[in-house]
Amino acid sequence: MNITGVDFICVPTRDWEKSKDFYGETLGLERSKRWGQMPASEFETGSLTIALMQADAFGIEFRPHSLPIALHVDDVQAAREELEGKGVKFPTDTIDSGVCHMAHFHDPDGNQLMLHSRYAPPGATPAEAAGGAGA
């Protein structure tokens, strides 16, 4: 077997109508397809497809994602301010890890999402990112 990538991730919803509006209008993601008449559709992020699925329509118990899906943006602060202007709440301040900026928030069903921007090369330590030892 040779797995060559991830085709899509599923995000469970309780209210597909509300969620599709959030992902499409609030986040500005392109809706690429609807799954027939099922309460499910796909949104494109540029590198990964997010499939929103109303859990009960597929016989699945609804449980929101407890770990965030990291959505890449060029400027976390600017993206955060844009979303705050649309009513999105952020439970914490923006985090600077030493290699990236992150801002956590939730979709209408409580799934965790994150705005993310890496400013250091992958694999760099915080010291290397800051120009310290080993840089």
Locate each region found by the language model.
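Core segments of cupin and vicinal oxygen chelate
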Residues: 10-50
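Vicinal oxygen chelate
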Residues: 1-2, 5-14, 41-44, 60-135
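Generic preference for hydrophobic
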Residues: 50-52, 115
